[in-house]
Amino acid sequence: MINSCVIPVIKSPSDYQAYRISPDDSNRLAIVFDPAIANSSLTCCVEIFDVGGKTPPNRHLFALEMFFILKGEGRATCDGKTVNIKAGDSLLVPATGTHIIENTGSGRLYTLTIMVPNEDFAELIRSGTPVELDAEDMAVLGRQYQ
């Protein structure tokens, strides 16, 4: 017998807050869920890489990071091993793995990025510069592209 009812948190792309962590970064992150929204130690965001864009080399002490490629193509490097990635691929980066995600395609690269536990990732994102999602971003997130 169910004794409680939990109402899920539902968001749409127009609700997402997007940031560029550093002014010179060539990727943006649109927060879908984070500890402040989900009351759980996770960060879920859509990461948008401009043509030629990439993350700086980074690693996490405790967190796993998963990337699901929504659109585009690129290259992922973790601890010196490089693989090509494209729409539909999933990539799981273990804790302590030094990694880079890079857009090698002719258009933007979009990933659904999930980090568990949060390990201050959401706070890092929110400390950056707020940016707007443009029409191309909204079309991808709203599944309005072919």
What positions do the PLM features span?
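A generic "binding-loop/recognition-motif" signal
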Residues: 25, 62-63, 81, 97-98, ...
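Conserved short histidine dyad/triad with adjacent acidic residue
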Residues: 31, 45-60
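Short acidic-glycine-tyrosine-enriched beta hairpin
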Residues: 80-95
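A short, N-terminal "cap"/entry segment at the start of jelly-roll beta-barrel domains
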Residues: 1-42, 126-146
